Every structure is written in C-alpha cells, then in structure tokens.
C-alpha cells in the first residue's frame, strides 16, 4: 500500500526494483465508522476514532486542499459533517480517508455514493421547426450530416433543483454522433446563460455570437458545450470577442440519445453557493462550433451556415428568458 501526498498538477513515476516487502497495516488507531452506501441530501455525518487529542485531516476523493480538520476527544472519538453538495454524479463512488500529515499515513478508506433528490421547477415546450435564427432565414450547412436531422431545434427545456444545485435537461429534435464526439453528441453547440438573483454586475453580451441577450437580461455565468468541450465562464472580462473568465468546477454533462436529451448538472459551488435560486434567470440557444462558433454567410456551404452575413447573430433556436419561481 502506497500513501503519498503530492502537490497539485504534479506526477510521480515509480519503477519496481524487484524486491518484495510484506504489506503492513497503516493508520494506527485512525478509523472511520461505516458510511451509508448512498447519501441523499447535501451533508454527510462522519464519525470515527483516533488517539485522544489527535488532530487529523478528513480527505474526500484525495483533495487535500479541501480537507476538514477533526480532533479526537478524550475518549478517542471524533465526529464532523461533510458537505456533499458538489457531488453531482450518482454513478461515482466517493472515497473518504483520514490523513495524518505528521506520520504521512492514511486510514482505511470508506466509500459512498451521493444521490440528489431533484424537484422540477421549470418546464417550457419550444415550437418544432423554428430553428431558423432570429431573422427566420438561417439555413443549416449543406453537408448531409445536418440534412433533416435538425440537431439545433429545441423541443423542451426542463429545470430541476436540489437545494441550490441545478439540473437542466434540453430535448432536441435529434441527437447524432456521426463524428464520434467525446461528449456523445455532434452537429450542435448549446450555450446557456444564467443571471443570479441579487447579484450585481453581469453582461448582456453573448460572446462570439454577434448578439445580446433578449429582454434586457444580464448574465453572470455562461455554459458552452458541444461534442468536444464543456466550458463554464464568469461574466468578468467578457466581451464580444472574449468568452469571459473560465471557472471550475463546471457542469456535469450526460447525454440520453434515445430520449434526445442533453442534461447539464451544476453544483451550488459552481453557482457561487447562493442562498436561493428564486428569481434567477436562464436563457439557452443553439448553433454549432468548430474552433469557434461555426461560420455564417449569405450563400452558406458544406460546413457553413447560410442565410445571413458574417456579422449577424449566430443563434439557430433559442428559449425565452426563463425566471425561477
């Protein structure tokens, strides 16, 4: 068993020398009590044992920078509450250990999965066949990969909440994987803008799309996703030619091709840990992306949208501005 703390963005190469050494137990008296297999909600109560008065670090998924300090009482018992709000994917098994930075040893790991309890807060059905841009004249590129697929035609947007975390489901007329995209969909890019309640600042500019947000909306967070990227931005530094300030963590992404639905998962941490999402606004549009939002020209082409000038809005289909109850 190897236990080693490494600085962020570092790596270690090990070469076996051929010698064998028996594995011995590590961690001394450090123990974490059994955890539930599945955690629902935004917190997890964690308890265990250590030497009386000993201060250790409780580490989730190997992230020492965000470790919580725990100190055992006179009886060698400790207890703390671990935030699970940022854990969005129920398929992932999360790992918790106690770490002794003095002795550089870790306890036996405990694992659990985190499952959100989502409630629907918004749903809007979008007209079929309105994927022709703000002018009504935009045409898909002529390559048959688009053809009758209409990957940019939004049919429904459904928003769910769990605390201040969000799940945004976008159902399209079709989802294709013709180009073997890493994210499970191609021939379309989705761009979403979120305005936070009670937050100053923001921007009306839709970076790189030659347009502004409708209805006077000003965004604080922006999501841009296509088959090979999934990026999350703050409005700081955003201009017509600058997407804003990249942020982490970003959105989780899941594609259900059978249901023609792309889902985005945003933790409360990604949204700045707001006390409430009541009054927040969401706007979403489609286009496509190829080293930038795909080109537009009056005549169009195999890989170029047609029906507009290069300076026209790069918006194929779009939602209204949706306001959270």
Describe the predicted segments one by one.
Residues 1-32:
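Carbohydrate-interacting/catalytic domains
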Residues 2-4, 77-85, 263-269:
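Exposed aromatic-hydrophobic patches
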Residues 26-114:
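Ser/Thr-rich low-complexity repeats and stalk/linker segments
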Residues 63-76, 81-83, 205-219, 247-254:
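Solvent-exposed serine/threonine-rich low-complexity stretches and specific carbohydrate-binding patches
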Residues 72-80, 168, 258-264:
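Glycine-centered loop-to-beta-strand initiation motif
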Residues 87-93, 179, 272-278:
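Short glycine/proline/serine/threonine-rich loop/turn segments at secondary-structure transition edges
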Residues 113-127, 195-216, 270-325:
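Acidic/polar low-complexity flexible segments
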Residues 119-124, 128, 138-229, 289-294:
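Surface-exposed, glycine/proline- and aromatic-rich loop segments on solvent-exposed faces
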């Amino acid at each position: 068993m190897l236990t080693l703390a490494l600085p962020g963005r570092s790596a270690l190469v090990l070469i076996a020398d051929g010698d064998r050494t028996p594995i011995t137990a590590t961690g001394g008296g450090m123990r974490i009590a059994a955890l539930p297999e599945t955690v629902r909600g935004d917190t997890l109560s964690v308890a265990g044992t250590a030497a009386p008065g000993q201060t250790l670090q409780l580490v989730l998924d190997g992230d020492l920078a965000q470790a919580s300090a725990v100190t055992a009482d006179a009886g060698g018992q400790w207890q703390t509450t671990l935030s699970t709000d940022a854990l969005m994917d129920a398929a992932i098994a999360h790992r918790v250990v106690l770490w002794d930075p003095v002795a550089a040893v870790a306890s036996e790991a405990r694992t659990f999965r985190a499952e959100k309890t989502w409630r629907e807060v918004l749903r809007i059905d979008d007209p079929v066949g309105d994927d022709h841009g703000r002018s009504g004249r935009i045409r898909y590129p002529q390559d048959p990969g688009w053809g009758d697929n209409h990957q940019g035609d939004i049919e429904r947007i459904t928003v769910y909440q769990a605390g201040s975390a969000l799940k945004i489901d976008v159902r399209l007329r079709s989802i294709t994987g013709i180009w073997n995209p890493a994210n499970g969909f191609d021939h379309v890019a989705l761009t979403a803008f979120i305005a936070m309640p009670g937050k100053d600042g923001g921007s009306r500019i839709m970076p790189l799309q030659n347009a502004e947000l409708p209805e006077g909306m000003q965004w604080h967070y922006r999501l841009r996703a296509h088959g090979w990227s999934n990026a999350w931005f703050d409005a700081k530094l955003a201009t017509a030619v600058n997407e804003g300030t990249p942020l982490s963590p970003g959105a989780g992404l899941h594609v259900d091709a059978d249901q023609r639905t792309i889902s985005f998962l945003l933790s409360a941490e990604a949204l700045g840990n707001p006390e409430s999402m009541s009054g927040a606004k969401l706007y979403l549009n489609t286009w496509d992306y190829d080293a930038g939002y795909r080109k537009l020209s009056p005549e169009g082409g195999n890989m170029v949208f047609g029906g507009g000038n290069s300076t026209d809005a790069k918006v194929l289909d779009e939602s209204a501005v949706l306001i959270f109850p």
